[in-house]
């Protein structure tokens, strides 16, 4: 009886392993079928990876709470509010930030709440907090990235943050935040940092993951150079949102870009639309000899080289490069990155 039980258990294990092997083989066949039929979407893979890496921090507070309340809660030690928070809407935003309002309004602006904190017993020493509710994290990242100051230094405060001598700038959830002091001093620098940390720690937000960011290789990409254009990138109105980043290739700095195109015709149709647009502006299409990138288009815009191509539903390219060979090399790097990711995800099967 004991021997029979052992034999039965051994047989059960063998059957289980055999079943797993069959299921694995069926999965490989299914992926291959999707690839052949054009049904595999590399972006769904990246989206899944991003979802796995994103976490929600447990908290009793939320960045969805009243902006005025948030400002009151981030008061640093040794400082006090100089009054009540000011609130600005679409109609009054330009009263506070004259000359810069259009960018915010185009990126989903909801409201701005501002509050000045003054040093106790020394009201001439102060800093002001600008809390922009942009409605969604991608909108907050867009305004953060597009107007990032060239003299800014990347900060470890938050994933997307930087500092200048008298200020700190960062995005957090749906908010884009600026904290600007009246002068440069250690006291104000410490107060601003404390206030920013109070906001981040007391009002945690869901981790921000931008799909387009994962579609561009990190290798040779300059940290903090990314910019998100929600519309009209490079003056082309038909573009969906476009992410750009600066790369160093062959000792040259160049701008790469990526856009996910889900409309009629997808990325392939967008490549043709953009080609026609550039030629309409006076661009000259140049023949590309022996490119490793299928369907690559190169347009000479009076010395500025525009290179672009599509892979799946993504349009990728190099914008306004001065060195043709370096631009072609970077385009090949972009294409290789996407195809390598695809092959890795499908067990070596080609795109």
Q: Residue spans of the language-model regions?
A:
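Short, well-ordered beta-strand elements
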Residues: 128-129, 174-182, 255-258, 313-321
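Juxtamembrane low-complexity tails/linkers enriched in Ser/Thr-Pro and polybasic
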Residues: 1-11
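Long, charged/polar, surface-exposed segments that mediate recognition or autoinhibition
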Residues: 134-150, 154-155, 193-204, 260-282, ...
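C-terminal soluble interaction/assembly domains
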Residues: 260-349
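N-terminal "mature-domain start" segment
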Residues: 9-126, 154, 176, 183-253, ...
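A cross-kingdom feature marking solvent-exposed beta-strand/loop segments within repeated
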Residues: 142-168, 178-179, 183-186, 278-305
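Short, solvent-exposed coil/turn segments at beta-strand boundaries
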Residues: 78, 170-176, 252, 292-294, ...
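Short, surface-exposed beta-strand/loop micro-motifs that present aromatic residues
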Residues: 112-119, 164-171, 241-249, 297-298, ...
């Amino acid at each position: 009886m004991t021997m029979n039980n052992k034999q039965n258990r051994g047989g059960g294990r063998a059957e289980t392993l055999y079943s797993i092997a069959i299921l694995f083989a069926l999965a490989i066949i299914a992926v291959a079928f999707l690839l052949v039929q054009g049904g595999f979407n590399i972006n769904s893979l990246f989206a899944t990876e991003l979802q796995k890496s994103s976490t929600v921090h447990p908290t009793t507070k939320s960045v969805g709470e009243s902006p005025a309340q948030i400002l009151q809660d981030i008061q640093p030690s040794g400082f006090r509010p100089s009054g009540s928070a000011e609130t600005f809407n679409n109609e009054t935003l330009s009263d506070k930030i004259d000359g810069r309002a259009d960018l915010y309004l185009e990126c989903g602006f909801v409201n701005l709440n501002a509050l000045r904190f003054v040093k106790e017993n020394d009201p001439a020493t102060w800093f002001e907090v600008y809390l922009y509710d942009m409605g969604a994290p991608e909108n907050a990242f867009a305004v953060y990235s597009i107007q990032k100051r060239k003299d800014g230094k990347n900060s470890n405060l938050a994933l997307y943050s930087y500092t200048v001598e008298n200020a700190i700038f960062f995005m957090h959830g749906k908010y884009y935040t600026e904290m600007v002091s009246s002068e440069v001093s250690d006291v104000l620098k410490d107060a601003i940092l404390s206030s920013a940390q109070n906001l981040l720690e007391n009002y945690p937000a869901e981790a921000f993951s931008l799909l387009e960011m994962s579609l561009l290789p990190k290798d040779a990409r300059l940290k903090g150079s990314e910019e998100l254009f929600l519309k009209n990138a490079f003056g082309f109105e038909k573009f969906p949102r476009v992410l750009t980043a600066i790369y160093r290739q062959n000792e040259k700095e160049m701008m790469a870009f990526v856009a996910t195109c889900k409309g009629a015709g997808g990325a392939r149709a967008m490549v043709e639309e953009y080609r026609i647009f550039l030629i309409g502006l006076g661009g000259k299409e140049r023949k590309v000899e022996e490119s490793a990138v299928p369907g690559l288009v190169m347009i000479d815009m009076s010395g500025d080289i525009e290179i672009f191509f599509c892979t799946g539903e993504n349009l990728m390219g190099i914008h306004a490069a001065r060195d043709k060979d370096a631009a072609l090399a970077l385009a090949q790097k972009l294409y290789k990155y996407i195809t390598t990711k695809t092959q890795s995800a499908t067990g070596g099967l080609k795109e």
